[in-house]
């Protein structure tokens, strides 16, 4: 049985990349990211997010193929704009594909996709994916020009990059980044886009973002995997979802006290 607390209030996409990172660290078959995804669904995840990187540093092709038919919710596949990745996505046909920038030397995704600067490439990728019946999302910075370009190239969804908000060193810096995200959510809605957000969010910084009425979905992974070390996987998923829903409803979840 899949548990959903206040469905439709705000969606939680649980990213399973770092379950695969832990598996790959020792070259074992455990922990199994497929099992993690299915348990996350049972604990209240509204979708499962996974990033098939070109270097396959965590999620592998076999993970994506094995997981797709087993999910009861949605698969949100993150990938770079390369012909290889687009072809894999069109073969597997997840419900959603989020196009992201990618550099092999980065530890994690460092910024948003430059849709305005790579407009024709992004537009063609959106068309190919849409032709396969896949809903396309673009991972972008909360920038007015990028949001307008995303709408113009035919993507129905954007995911606002919250990394700078999450990594802010001072309250003033964090407040400024939060305002950019809030303004970006408003701009996205005015362009008729579904607005999601994610990157670097954890148990003590997610509340202001989750409270924004224009945000439909948050994608969170590393913080949930880290918290699960201490509380258990399903509990970590349930707690994150409860914190998000409480923030959206204007209340405070009592356990929101430590990042992990």
UniProtKB/Swiss-Prot annotation:
The keyword Transferase applies. Pfam families: PdxJ. InterPro entries: Aldolase_TIM (IPR013785), PyrdxlP_synth_PdxJ (IPR004569), Pyridoxine-5'_phos_synth (IPR036130). Its EC number is 2.6.99.2. It is found in: Cytoplasm. Keywords: Cytoplasm, Pyridoxine biosynthesis, Transferase. 1-deoxy-D-xylulose 5-phosphate binds at residues 17-18, 53, 58, 108. GO terms for biological process: pyridoxine biosynthetic process. One of its GO terms (cellular component) is cytosol. 3-amino-2-oxopropyl phosphate binds at residues 15, 26, 200, 221-222. The active site is at 51 (proton acceptor), 78 (proton acceptor), 199 (proton donor). The keyword Cytoplasm applies. It catalyses: 3-amino-2-oxopropyl phosphate + 1-deoxy-D-xylulose 5-phosphate = pyridoxine 5'-phosphate + phosphate + 2 H2O + H(+). Pathway: Cofactor biosynthesis; pyridoxine 5'-phosphate biosynthesis; pyridoxine 5'-phosphate from D-erythrose 4-phosphate: step 5/5. The record marks 159 as: Transition state stabilizer. Belongs to the PNP synthase family. Catalyzes the complicated ring closure reaction between the two acyclic compounds 1-deoxy-D-xylulose-5-phosphate (DXP) and 3-amino-2-oxopropyl phosphate (1-amino-acetone-3-phosphate or AAP) to form pyridoxine 5'-phosphate (PNP) and inorganic phosphate. This is Pyridoxine 5'-phosphate synthase. It comes from Cupriavidus taiwanensis (strain DSM 17343 / BCRC 17206 / CCUG 44338 / CIP 107171 / LMG 19424 / R1) (Ralstonia taiwanensis (strain LMG 19424)).
């Amino acid at each position: 049985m899949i548990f959903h607390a206040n469905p439709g209030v705000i969606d939680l996409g649980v990213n399973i990349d770092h379950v695969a990172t832990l598996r790959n660290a020792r070259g074992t078959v455990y922990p199994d990211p497929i099992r993690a995804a299915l348990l996350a669904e049972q604990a209240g995840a509204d979708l499962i997010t996974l990033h098939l990187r070109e270097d396959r540093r965590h999620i592998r092709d076999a993970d994506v193929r094995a997981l797709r038919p087993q999910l009861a919710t949605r698969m949100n596949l993150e990938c770079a704009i390369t012909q290889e990745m687009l072809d894999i996505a069109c073969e597997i046909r997840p419900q959603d594909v989020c196009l992201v920038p990618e550099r092999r030397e980065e530890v994690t995704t460092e910024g948003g996709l430059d849709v305005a600067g790579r407009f024709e490439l992004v537009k063609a990728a959106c068309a190919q994916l849409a032709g396969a019946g896949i809903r396309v999302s673009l991972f972008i910075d909360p920038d007015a020009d990028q949001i307008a370009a995303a709408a113009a190239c035919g993507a129905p969804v954007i995911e606002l990059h919250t990394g700078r908000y999450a990594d802010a060193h001072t309250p003033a810096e964090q407040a400024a980044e939060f305002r950019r995200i809030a303004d970006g959510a408003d701009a996205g809605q005015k362009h008729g886009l579904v607005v999601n957000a994610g990157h670097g969010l954890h148990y003590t910084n997610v509340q202001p973002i989750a409270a924004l009425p224009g945000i439909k979905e948050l994608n969170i992974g590393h913080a949930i995997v880290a918290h699960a070390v201490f509380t258990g996987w399903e509990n970590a998923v349930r707690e994150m979802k409860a914190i998000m829903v409480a923030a959206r409803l204007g209340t405070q979840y009592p356990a929101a006290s430590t990042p992990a």
